[in-house]
UniProtKB/Swiss-Prot annotation:
Record family assignment: Belongs to the DapB family.
EC number, UniProt record: 1.17.1.8
Organism: Burkholderia multivorans (strain ATCC 17616 / 249)
One cellular-component annotation, GO: cytosol
Pfam families on file: DapB_C, DapB_N
Location(s) in or outside the cell: Cytoplasm
Binding site for NAD(+): G7, A8, S9, G10, R11, M12, D33, G96, T97, T98, A120, A121, N122, M123
Top-level taxon in the UniProt lineage: Bacteria
Protein role: Catalyzes the conversion of 4-hydroxy-tetrahydrodipicolinate (HTPA) to tetrahydrodipicolinate.
Reactions that this protein is recorded to catalyse: (S)-2,3,4,5-tetrahydrodipicolinate + NAD(+) + H2O = (2S,4S)-4-hydroxy-2,3,4,5-tetrahydrodipicolinate + NADH + H(+); (S)-2,3,4,5-tetrahydrodipicolinate + NADP(+) + H2O = (2S,4S)-4-hydroxy-2,3,4,5-tetrahydrodipicolinate + NADPH + H(+)
Entry's Gene Ontology BP terms: diaminopimelate biosynthetic process; lysine biosynthetic process via diaminopimelate
InterPro entries: DapB_C, DapB_N, DapB_N_CS, DHDPR_bac, NAD(P)-bd_dom_sf
Key words, A-Z: Amino-acid biosynthesis, Cytoplasm, Diaminopimelate biosynthesis, Lysine biosynthesis, NAD, NADP, Oxidoreductase
Name this polypeptide is given: 4-hydroxy-tetrahydrodipicolinate reductase
Length: 265
């Protein structure tokens, strides 16, 4: 599996590089970084004390010419540039980027008609199993329970609520036969009045080096149920991304998520 990594000098990029280097079936063939990054020209394995022979570069086409797969956990604007390159070079994509607008997501859907893409806000096995638990719980706590989603991440995260929190909200709303767009409440401030029981609330915490904590609260009268997933390391995301690469090896086109990769549909 000839794999290139986007955002190679970042926290997630480095975790992905390490995972690829430790996988006997994978070969690191490219490492993309943003233009102007001080890491450009460095060996991709320098942070591990390894000489991989792969240098960090901002030459998108040069990297795509070497790769069969690109793993991308960057930002929407960068990811869309990589999608264009994937179409030019027929490279399959594993995308963990969050913060896309509806219009940007439409670009991914269109691209998937020509190349195979796994697009998931969270690629950990635990989170994706949690989504199934939430669907089950929502069906049984549909009446008399208020639903709130609380997420916490490190101080550097730029979007809120997190993509994972939105995935959880969509899982719950879907199980209840609702559209998240119609029932989500993002944060509360001032005099808000009584809570509308049909809503799903979101709260976001940012601080320190929190990798990712997510809790879905079903609050009833006399009891509350909390379903929580906590990430202590990004390694689970990296391992999930490699599972997604293996899944794509048997696909030529189509847009998939981790529920497809893990056979949870």
């Amino acid at each position: 599996m000839k794999i290139a990594i986007a955002g190679a000098s970042g926290r997630m990029g480095r975790m992905l590089i390490e995972a690829v280097l430790n996988d006997a079936d994978a070969q690191l063939v490219g490492a993309l970084d943003r233009a102007g990054s001080p890491s450009l020209g460095q060996d991709a394995g320098a942070f591990l004390g390894k000489d991989t022979g792969v240098k960090l570069t901002d030459d998108i086409d040069a990297v795509f010419a070497q790769a069969d797969y690109l793993i991308d956990f960057t930002r929407p604007e960068g990811t869309l540039a990589h999608v264009e390159a994937a179409l030019r070079h027929d490279v399959k994509l594993v995308i963990g980027t969050t913060g896309f607008t509806a219009e940007q997501k439409a670009v991914l859907h269109a691209a998937a008609e020509k190349v195979a893409i796994v697009f998931a806000a969270n690629m950990s096995v635990g989170v994706n199993v949690t989504l199934k638990l939430l669907e089950f719980a929502a069906k049984h706590f549909s009446h008399g329970y208020d639903i709130e989603i609380i997420e916490a991440h490190h101080r550097h995260k730029v979007d809120a609520p997190s993509g994972t929190a939105l995935m959880m909200g969509e899982a719950v709303a879907g199980a209840l036969g609702r559209s998240l767009d119609d029932c989500a409440v993002y944060g509360r401030h001032g005099v808000t009045g009584e809570r509308d029981p049909s809503t799903i609330g979101f709260a976001a915490v940012r601080g320190g080096d929190i990798v990712g904590d997510h809790t879905v609260l079903f609050a009833g009268i006399g009891e509350r149920i909390e379903i929580t997933h906590k990430s202590s390391s990004r390694v689970s995301y990296a391992q999930g991304a490699l599972r997604a690469v293996r899944f794509l090896s048997a696909r030529d086109t189509g847009l998939f998520d981790m529920q497809d990769v893990l056979g949870l549909r």
